[in-house]
Amino acid sequence: MNLKTGRVLKISGPLVVAEGMEEANIYDVVKVGEKRLIGEIIEMREDRASIQVYEETAGLAPGDPVITTGEPLSVELGPGLIEAMFDGIQRPLNAIKAKAGDFITRGVEVHSLDRDRKWHFTPVKKVGDTVEAGDVIGIVQETSIVEHKIMVPYGIKGTIETIEEGDFTVVDTVAKVKDKDKVSDLIMMQKWPVRRGRPYGRKLNPVEPMITGQRVIDTFFPVTKGGTACVPGPFGSGKTVVQHQLAKWADAQIVVYIGCGERGNEMTDVLNEFPELKDPKTGEPLMKRTVLIANTSNMPVAAREASIYTGITIGEYFRDMGYSVALMADSTSRWAEALREMSGRLEEMPGDEGYPAYLGSRAADFYERAGKVLSLGSEGREGALTVIGAVSPPGGDLSEPVTQATLRIVKVFWGLDSQLAYRRHFPAINWLNSYSLYLEKISPWMDENVASDWTALRTRAMSLLQEEANLEEIVRLVGIDALSEKDRLKLEVAKSLREDYLQQNAFHEVDTYASLEKQYKMLKLVLFFYDETQRALNAGIYLKELLDLEVRDKIARAKYISEESIENIDAIFNELSEVIDQLISKGGIMNA
């Protein structure tokens, strides 16, 4: 495609204005300067194009050439995505290291997917079959746990003329489809523009929870498969550890982790831990289902904006195969700051705190690409894309624009609290501020698949925690002695809920993950203790005697009982019941 070459007119940080670009279109990818830096046109005025450059612009000068590719910023989708680590514009970091060394050289050009590696393609359709966009024509065993489905690209339909099994690269023809007089060659790779959501049949109502193994999330503030959630919190409150825990243990089949403008060490942690950690369902390393996008704080600011879209497009691709995908974006605040930077350079009218007026609509465009869908194609596959975004409000101020724009869109809010973090209560999700709007949808599933009284237990536990907050106000004013024995018991049970149930150690090999069965038994145990001690109080037993029971230590240590020995929790129920019966039969101190 021979398009006219433009010239750089002015440079302002990551923004380059070029003239002579009348043949280009908005969102076209361009190559800027002699080093062919990658950029994207974000505004057109007559023949002048404002270009967001995704690499360091030092050394560019007015008059340097600007060449348009005539294509929008797109990602390559095909075998080779899983276990890979890309930068914000889908350049594989391993390939860059092999080509240019430890540091990313400006203007380096490498293919996103390896063109030399061969994959074994197994057809599932045969010659003569009629196919349409979205139909699976064959599979590639990409890793031991991910079966990569090769789909007919959007816009192609017809009858299969040739299809064969064998080892192919991602650009080799694996099948030919004929529609009337037109024959299309199908390869294992597709290209898709990142700013456009991938098409699907229709959206479905999400009713199944995404089980994360984190008790405070699964019990009180669950997110559905295909839902949206945000994790806002001040520095040091544990946002990244929450995101890592979700990436490790969420029951999604594919995880896309975007490190957007955060520290490089956090991506290093993921690279070190994930190959060693085993998926609880398959027993395979977690890395075998993970795609990493690393756009750390020391990389150019503009690429942060692209990294979010790159990640969600890859997520949509796996969703279209019928997989449940979880996408973690850490942190969307850095993405919003990149928007603010470019908006300022474009001299647009600033909105709240200097962010552009379109911050809310851009955030909505991103989160609305989540969902549970019926994929294109005749097979009717169901896939889900769950999006969880971390937000880093300066000083933990939840009234700032990025948090407010996010809260208007997402259905689940896990509010991290610095006070809880300072008390070493992790995950520091504040149970009084957080909410989940999926509870009504999820409750029937929980009652059916976990236990019939799950919703009732959850409601009781939450009301106890809320009563504790009210009673603490009274204690602060007049002291604990002003409370009745029953109210003091409520405080003790709420403390047990906080410390023995909600608190969870992400770095303990057993406590890092709790199955729904274990969560149910632990929650029921704490509330059973409340019921039994109330029975004892009514029979005239002193509260102090009940609080000194040795069985309380066993309740506190129930979180460290492994999934294989889960029946040991049932033994604590029996022991507690026997101890209370003995106390009542003895009559306690009051009746001695």
Curated annotation (Swiss-Prot):
One of its GO terms (molecular function) is proton-transporting ATPase activity, rotational mechanism. It catalyses: ATP + H2O + 4 H(+)(in) = ADP + phosphate + 5 H(+)(out). Its EC number is 7.1.2.2. One of its GO terms (biological process) is proton motive force-driven plasma membrane ATP synthesis. InterPro entries: ATP-synt_VA_C (IPR055190), ATP-synth_a_Xtn (IPR031686), ATP_synth_asu-like_sf (IPR023366), ATPase_a/bsu_AS (IPR020003), ATPase_F1/V1/A1_a/bsu_N (IPR004100), ATPase_F1/V1/A1_a/bsu_N_sf (IPR036121), ATPase_F1/V1/A1_a/bsu_nucl-bd (IPR000194), ATPase_F1/V1_b/a_C (IPR024034). Keywords: ATP synthesis, ATP-binding, Hydrogen ion transport, Ion transport, Nucleotide-binding, Translocase, Transport. ATP binds at residues 233-240. The keyword ATP-binding applies. Pfam families: ATP-synt_ab (PF00006), ATP-synt_ab_N (PF02874), ATP-synt_ab_Xtn (PF16886), ATP-synt_VA_C (PF22919). GO terms for cellular component: proton-transporting ATP synthase complex. NCBIfam families: PRK04192.1 (NF003220). Produces ATP from ADP in the presence of a proton gradient across the membrane. The V-type alpha chain is a catalytic subunit. Belongs to the ATPase alpha/beta chains family. PANTHER family: H(+)-TRANSPORTING TWO-SECTOR ATPASE, V-TYPE PROTON ATPASE CATALYTIC SUBUNIT A. This is V-type ATP synthase alpha chain. It comes from Clostridium botulinum (strain Loch Maree / Type A3). The gene is atpA.
